[in-house]
């Protein structure tokens, strides 16, 4: 199995870039991870729905064929670290070729992306910036694989 993260926008804050790079490198020990950064639509005079649609079009074009798609959304299903680990393990056992996780931009995801997703998942009931969400997601993926492998990182 491979993991693809489709992310709207770049990490512009140094400590987030460093943290994300660290967890991306750690994840590579378990399976190939690819992060695709998509152009963030400028807000200017554009309304939020227009921005979501434009970013959504770019996201939909980049979803790999045959991939199981998880879109991050504030109204998505909340999962614990253990449940995420179980989901990762299930997809590895079922030989899912690729798991694609989508992080929208500042205004979230358009309905078309949410409808395309096989699962909507929430990282937290609190609002996170899309840049912070990337770091949290990478850490949780790493934590999930350490749980699956019974490695000493996650404290039960």
Curated annotation (Swiss-Prot):
It catalyses: pseudouridine(1915) in 23S rRNA + S-adenosyl-L-methionine = N(3)-methylpseudouridine(1915) in 23S rRNA + S-adenosyl-L-homocysteine + H(+). It is an enzyme of class 2 (transferase). Pfam families: SPOUT_MTase. Its EC number is 2.1.1.177. S-adenosyl-L-methionine binds at residues 72, 104, 123-128. The keyword S-adenosyl-L-methionine applies. It comes from the Bacteria. One of its GO terms (cellular component) is cytoplasm. The keyword DNA-binding does not apply. Keywords: Cytoplasm, Methyltransferase, rRNA processing, S-adenosyl-L-methionine, Transferase. It is found in: Cytoplasm. Belongs to the RNA methyltransferase RlmH family. This is Ribosomal RNA large subunit methyltransferase H.
């Amino acid at each position: 199995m491979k993991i693809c993260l489709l992310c709207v926008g770049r990490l512009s804050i140094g400590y987030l870039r460093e943290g994300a790079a660290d967890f991306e490198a750690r994840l590579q020990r378990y399976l190939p991870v690819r992060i695709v950064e998509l152009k963030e639509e400028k807000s200017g005079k554009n309304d939020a729905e227009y921005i979501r649609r434009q970013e959504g079009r770019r996201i939909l074009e980049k979803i790999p064929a045959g991939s199981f798609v998880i879109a991050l959304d504030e109204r998505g299903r909340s999962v614990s670290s253990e449940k995420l680990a179980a989901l990762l393990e299930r997809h590895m056992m079922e030989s899912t070729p690729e798991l694609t996780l989508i992080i929208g931009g500042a205004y979230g995801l358009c309905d078309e992306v949410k409808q395309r997703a096989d699962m909507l998942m929430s990282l937290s009931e609190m609002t996170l910036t899309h840049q912070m969400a990337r770091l949290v997601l990478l850490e949780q993926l790493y934590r999930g694989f350490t749980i699956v492998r019974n490695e000493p990182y996650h404290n039960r």
